[in-house]
């Protein structure tokens, strides 16, 4: 069987599995966020933090909860990294010194669900930091994203109220009832597939295929690997990330990791449909996500399987930076999934992708990561796009736009438009400043279009909370640590505040009955319109920069 055929089977089985779990997992998450029953563990947590689980919050109080929790998390993780040398399970001789700027960058990175890593995990962070710091944030940062998405859905579903739920309840439920159970099962499957799970502080000896001995650091890898993918975090225990055989040993575990990356994102539209009382609306949103996902994955495989250049022509594909145990097709599917979500994990070297393959990964992030996007953030990003789409459609027919019975008034469209201005402003401004500073240009391993692509990729990844990188950029400097940390923080929390403000504005409205002029938002026509608006918005915003970077490199 050729690698291309194997890759197509890999993709077909993946799609079939995602379709199979869409309804049951989506319905389960609907019950999690709508039930009035609390688990005993949850009631204990609420008592400890002084939360009344039955009280609800306005959008402002909900946003303050998100910001307060995230701020405390950043401070805790920042301090934990700086003092790890005095704590148990620390590395006695770390290869990279944890400076304040690197600790800031890493703390913001994991709290914002970005997991940008300007260091080698296995030689910089001790096991206690990995478990009590980074892995914990892998859970709760994703739970924050799901909570915000659910709050926006409540804004569409509720009528004439200022309340959107309780952030602390949504946070705890998302962590304990959704992320933790799936992670336990996934970790067992990864260990069964060959991923390691131990507490070896020092190097463990392994035998290579050539029969020689090699020493590699061990650690609690499988437990962190599963939540890294499931919660679309992406930060690896090892510098090689999911290309490392201790994290991702076989083609089977590679398939499982891609499935984990996509499963919650593609199931949340079902939750949305159930919560607004119309499952067809959820199918429409899922169809937009699926269309963009398959389109991107198809282009990625096409560009990576083209035989341009001497070496690719000789081996039949662009094999540079690709693990032979996965092959080009499987790695292409992984690369598309990890950049269409906010994951950023890699099983191949993205800096070694073909120029157009690298452009696809950047374009995926610049879409706003909505196909299916990050855990929670993909759904609320897609719903904001739906709001913009009905506004554009309303302009064409000359009537006030409506979505799910809610009028899209000037306030709502201003909030939606502002949401999609945040990330481009951060990406383009950050890239321009970096290219204007001689010292930061010196951090590029390549000159010309590919050098620009390295910097553009870094700010695109940071602002969209992805975390993957073109490895040719030396990012562990005071300037990049600070600038990318700010990009991650603003790229995460400004959109969240705007989404919650939009949810609050929608919740205060009554319901507008459908009329003959109401745009049906559950039909293929609307699916095509949302996909078209998404592609047009991104093309108009980023095409000039892409033309100077990967497109120019591809033409050359």
Swiss-Prot record:
Q: Does the keyword Transmembrane helix apply?
A: yes
Q: Which InterPro entries does the record cross-reference, listed alphabetically?
A: KdpA (IPR004623)
MF terms (GO), sorted A to Z: P-type potassium transmembrane transporter activity; potassium ion binding
Which compartment or compartments is the protein found in? Cell membrane
Q: Which UniProt keywords apply?
A: Cell membrane, Ion transport, Membrane, Potassium, Potassium transport, Transmembrane, Transmembrane helix, Transport
Does this UniProt record's set of keywords contain Transmembrane helix?
Answer: yes
Q: How does it sit in the membrane?
A: Multi-pass membrane protein
Source species, domain of life: Bacteria
Q: Report the protein's function.
A: Part of the high-affinity ATP-driven potassium transport (or Kdp) system, which catalyzes the hydrolysis of ATP coupled with the electrogenic transport of potassium into the cytoplasm. This subunit binds the extracellular potassium ions and delivers the ions to the membrane domain of KdpB through an intramembrane tunnel.
**HAMAP family from the UniProt entry:** KdpA
Whom does it interact with, and what assembly results?
The system is composed of three essential subunits: KdpA, KdpB and KdpC.
Q: Which family does it belong to?
A: Belongs to the KdpA family.
Its recorded name reads: Potassium-transporting ATPase potassium-binding subunit
Q: Lineage of the source organism?
A: Bacteria, Bacillati, Actinomycetota, Actinomycetes, Mycobacteriales
Gene this chain is encoded by: kdpA
């Amino acid at each position: 069987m050729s690698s291309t055929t194997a890759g197509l089977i890999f993709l077909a089985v993946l799609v079939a599995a995602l379709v199979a779990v869409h309804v049951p997992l989506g319905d389960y998450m609907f019950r999690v966020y709508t039930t009035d029953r609390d688990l005993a563990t949850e009631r204990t947590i609420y008592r400890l933090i002084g939360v009344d689980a039955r009280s609800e919050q306005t959008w402002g109080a909900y946003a303050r909860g998100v910001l307060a929790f995230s701020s405390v998390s950043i401070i805790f993780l920042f301090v934990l990294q700086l003092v790890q040398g005095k704590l148990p399970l620390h590395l006695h001789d770390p290869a990279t010194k944890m400076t304040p700027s690197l600790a800031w960058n890493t703390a913001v990175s994991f709290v914002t669900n970005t997991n940008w890593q300007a260091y080698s995990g296995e030689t910089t962070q001790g096991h206690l930091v990995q478990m009590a710091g980074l892995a914990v944030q892998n859970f709760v940062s994703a739970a924050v994203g799901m909570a915000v998405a659910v709050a926006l859905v409540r804004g569409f579903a509720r009528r004439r109220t200022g309340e959107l739920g309780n952030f602390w309840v949504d946070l705890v439920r998302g962590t304990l009832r959704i992320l933790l159970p799936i992670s336990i099962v996934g970790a067992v499957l990864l260990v069964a597939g060959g991923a390691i799970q131990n507490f070896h502080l020092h190097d463990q000896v392994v035998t290579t295929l050539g029969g020689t001995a090699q020493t590699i650091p061990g650690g609690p890898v499988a437990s962190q690997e599963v939540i890294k993918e499931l919660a679309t975090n992406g930060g690896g225990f090892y510098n090689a990330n999911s290309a490392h055989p201790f994290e991702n040993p076989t083609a089977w575990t590679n398939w499982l990791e891609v499935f984990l990356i996509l499963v919650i994102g593609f199931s949340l539209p079902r939750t949305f449909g159930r919560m607004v009382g119309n499952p067809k609306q959820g199918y429409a949103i899922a169809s937009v996500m699926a269309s963009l996902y398959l389109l991107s994955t198809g282009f990625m495989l096409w560009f990576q399987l083209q035989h341009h250049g001497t070496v690719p022509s000789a081996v039949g594909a662009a094999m540079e930076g690709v693990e032979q145990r996965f092959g080009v097709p499987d790695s292409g599917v992984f690369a598309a999934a990890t950049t269409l979500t906010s994951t950023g994990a890699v099983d191949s070297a993205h800096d070694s992708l073909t120029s157009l393959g690298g452009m696809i990964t950047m374009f995926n992030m610049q879409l706003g990561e909505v196909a299916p996007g990050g855990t929670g953030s993909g759904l609320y990003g897609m719903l904001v796009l739906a709001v913009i789409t009905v506004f554009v459609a309303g302009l064409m027919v000359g009537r006030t736009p409506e979505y799910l019975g809610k009028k899209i008034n000037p306030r709502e469209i201003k909030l939606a438009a502002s949401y999609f201005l945040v990330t481009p402003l951060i990406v383009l401004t950050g890239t321009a400043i970096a290219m204007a500073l001689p010292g930061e240009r010196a951090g590029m391993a390549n000159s010309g279009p590919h050098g620009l692509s390295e910097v553009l990729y870094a700010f695109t990844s940071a602002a969209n909370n992805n975390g993957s990188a073109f490895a040719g950029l030396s990012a562990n400097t005071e300037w990049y640590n600070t600038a990318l940390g700010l990009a991650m923080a603003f790229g995460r929390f400004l959109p969240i505040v705007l989404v919650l403000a939009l949810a609050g504005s929608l919740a205060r409205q009554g319901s507008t009955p459908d009329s003959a002029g109401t745009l049906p938002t559950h039909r293929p026509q609307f699916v095509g319109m949302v996909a078209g608006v998404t592609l047009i918005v991104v093309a108009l915003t980023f095409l000039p920069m892409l033309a100077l970077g990967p497109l120019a490199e591809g033409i050359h």
